[in-house]
Structure formats: structure tokens, C-alpha cells
């Protein structure tokens, strides 16, 4: 009997499944950078005195690159760089090195005026771990900038979507808008490509160049073609942030949903100890908004894509979750079936589809984009 360990919050839980009931554990192929390659790429980052590093991700890979970057620049005699992170990453970023560097949170004024913040420094570098985004297609510096610093442009990006379905790994109009906005930002970006456990590549250059290259590399490594399946059990992976709120975990569901056949079932491991994680989800479960109001509102509300995706897809798929959130929120308001354990999940799937049913497992869904019936080579088309 194969035993698969899946991350759930801060712990690993075992999926005890018979060999005949396991279709496949879907894992992307990332070839790790060699140590000399890793060091060489960071040597090329042009940081000098009075430089600013804006950290946009909190993955283990991001922390590794940040710590090594600090060691690299201090080894060059650079002693004054400022490191700041997004407020939502509070408690997730620490710098493991022998230097006296620490990170601080961006202030409210910094968030309001990104241009003004950058103008205070000789050089600015954004640091981001490339992933998938259900609205933009890919996540990286440009999408973080719109989501965290540019409310008007975020609303415009949301209005450019062609439907209410998630589109991870797709170059779309929201993606192109994010790129075009960042062309005018006087900064560089470091985009990391890898999964929860390794770094496959690092791109440093203009924001546009780094993001387009990292998007291509990510889909090359993790855009996995699979046959459609009846069921999938989905874990975000071992990066803690993606377990912390329902909003973060739902991104992993949207990465995986396109391999399901009609009326298939996806079960998400989404502990969500930090709550719902977005204003739109909070408003929706509290009855302060509905899908029609969100659709008619010309201003983007944080997390509203998740409400609209759930509404649009509930007739085609069955979604379930293991979570610490109240059942009333999950089941009654959001339409998610709730489970207490993987054993209960497996029992439910076998009762529904038969004792010989085979289950697919995604153990690192934040950095995986399986899909069926789509030519991946034709999918990634940059402007």
C-alpha cells in the first residue's frame, strides 16, 4: 500500500491508499540549479549602496535567494541596502545570514506611492517566486505590483478577463496589461523559477524581461499534460503561506481544475488558520455582497475572482475541502463539501465512483499546472 505524505498547514498528513486506487501522483519536473550556477546568477545582480529590495513572495526559495543575495552584496562591500516586504508577508520572511540585515514591512504610504518609494533609492530590485495566477495566468512582479500597489490598474485588469473561469498558464489581456504598466517602473526584478523544494532558474533584468522568461520556464517545467480524471486530491505544497488562508489555497485548486472530467471531484487541503484571506470572500460569506453585485461593481474587490470562479464552476465540478474554517462558511455559503480527514475523503470517493476508482494526487499544486486536451507549446504566447 503506497503511503503519500501531503502538507496540511504546518504538518504532513498521510494518504493511505491502495495501489489499485492510485492513478498517479502528479509532480512537475524541476532540474535544480547547481551551486555554482546559483552563485553566478546572484553575482550579476547590480545592487549598490542605498539600494532597495522589495520582497513579494515568502517561499523557501525566496528566503534562500534573499539570504544569499545579502551575503553576495556585503561580500562586495555594500553595507547599506534596505529590505522591505508586503504587509501580508509579516512573519514569513527572515534573513538567514551572518550580517546585520533585517526586513521591515512596507508602510501605508509606501503602498500608496510606489513611485515615490522607489525614488528615494539609487536602485530598486523586486524579488518574486514565479507561480500561476488564475486571473493573469502567471504570478510574478508585475501581477504583485498591480494587486498590491495599483488599485485602478487592478480593476482594469479584472475587466479585461474574457469569462469567469480560471486561466492559469495562459497569456491573456490582464497579463499583457500588467507587463505594460511595469515598463515605466524604474526598477529591476529577480524572478525565481522552481517548486516548493528546489530552484530551477533565476532571472534578473528588467521587470518585463524577467517575468516573460520566468513564465516560459515555469510552463516548460510544470505545465504537465494529463488525461482527464474523475477525482484529484490537492495540496498546495510545503510553502506555508499557501496553506494559511482560503484565498491562497484556492489558487492551487484553480491550477488543477482543468484536468477534471465533467462532474469530477477535487478535494483541497486548505487549513486556512489565518482565515478567509480576502475582502470579497469575507463580504460574500457574511452576506454583504453577491456574485451579481461583484460583477456589476466597476472596482475590483480583493479576492473577488474566487467567488466568481466558485459560482461559475459549481455546476460542472464538485469541490471539497479539509480545513479549520467553519463549516457554515465552507459548505453553506461557498458550496464546498467538508471533510475531517483524508481517510474520509478516500472513502467518499470510492463510494461515489466505485471500489476500483483511481485517484490523482497533486502534492505541490502551487507550482503545478496540469491540463488535458491543450497543446502546451501553443499556449504560451507573449505579446
Language-model features and meaning:
Residues 38-55, 74-78, 223-231, 259-261, ...:
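Glycine-rich phosphate/diphosphate-binding loops that line cofactor/substrate pockets in enzymes
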Residues 50-62, 82-85, 233-235:
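Short glycine-rich or small-residue beta-strand-to-loop segments that form or flank ligand, phosphate
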Residues 70-100:
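Anionic-ligand anchoring segments at beta-strand to alpha-helix junctions in alpha/beta enzyme folds, i.e.
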Residues 250, 254-383:
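C-terminal non-catalytic interaction/assembly regions of soluble proteins
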